Amino acid sequence: MKYTEIKEKSLQELEGLLKEKKLELFGLRMKLKTMQLQDTSAIRKTRKDIARIKTAIAEKRRAG
């Protein structure tokens, strides 16, 4: 997910998206531990998406 897409969303949408991504990351980690995960780079991509979302949330809160 690109930062420009994330930046356009409202604060509530971002918080919902953050929750979804955290659940997705949890699921990916479980798949990794049970040897079911084929694309191990998905964990890194999801972590980066979470960081982008957190950055956008902080930016919106600072702006008011």
UniProtKB/Swiss-Prot annotation:
GO BP term, pick one: translation
Gene3D superfamilies associated with the record: 1.10.287.310
GO CC annotation, single: cytosolic large ribosomal subunit
Molecular function via GO: structural constituent of ribosome
InterPro entries named in the record: Ribosomal_protein_uL29, Ribosomal_uL29, Ribosomal_uL29_sf
Superkingdom of origin: Bacteria
Keywords: Ribonucleoprotein, Ribosomal protein
Family: Belongs to the universal ribosomal protein uL29 family.
Name of the protein in its database record: Large ribosomal subunit protein uL29
Species annotation: Nitratiruptor sp. (strain SB155-2)
